[in-house]
């Protein structure tokens, strides 16, 4: 959804760098396929995911971040105790650079347990990025 239906080969790192700063290996995005979904439907889902992090949404606390965020809260039923809470987000919503997923076992609602953790991670990621560009 975040990449307009395009599915890329996942990488945990973008490049490997030697101690001297030279690049050993650079990983480029590799398109693996795409979803058979119309752009109209993708736009609808993306809009709904952005609304989750706006006023009135279940993760509206993320609206205070310096970038727009799209996300989805969730609760997974647990027959052995309190439900598990989860939240997934990508940011910036218009041109995603990061995806963060958090599940809190027995955390109840994702909006209460997992979303604040994701917010903290995104604050860190974008604060560090702003330092790098002198903002």
Where are these regions (language model features)?
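Active-site beta-strand/loop architecture of penicillin-binding DD-peptidases
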Residues: 1-32, 49-134
């Amino acid at each position: 959804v975040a990449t307009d239906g395009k599915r890329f080969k996942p990488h945990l790192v973008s490049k490997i760098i030697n101690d001297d700063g030279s690049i050993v290996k650079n990983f480029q995005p590799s398109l693996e396929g795409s979803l058979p979904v119309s752009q109209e439907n993708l736009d609808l889902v993306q809009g709904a995911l952005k609304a989750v992090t706006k006023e009135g949404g279940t993760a509206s606390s993320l609206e205070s971040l310096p970038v727009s965020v799209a996300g989805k809260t969730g609760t997974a039923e647990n027959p052995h105790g309190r439900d598990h809470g989860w939240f997934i987000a990508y940011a910036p919503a218009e041109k995603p650079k990061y995806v963060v997923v958090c599940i809190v076992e027995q955390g109840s609602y994702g909006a209460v347990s997992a979303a604040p953790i994701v917010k903290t991670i995104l604050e860190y990621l974008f604060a560090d990025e702003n330092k790098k560009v002198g903002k």
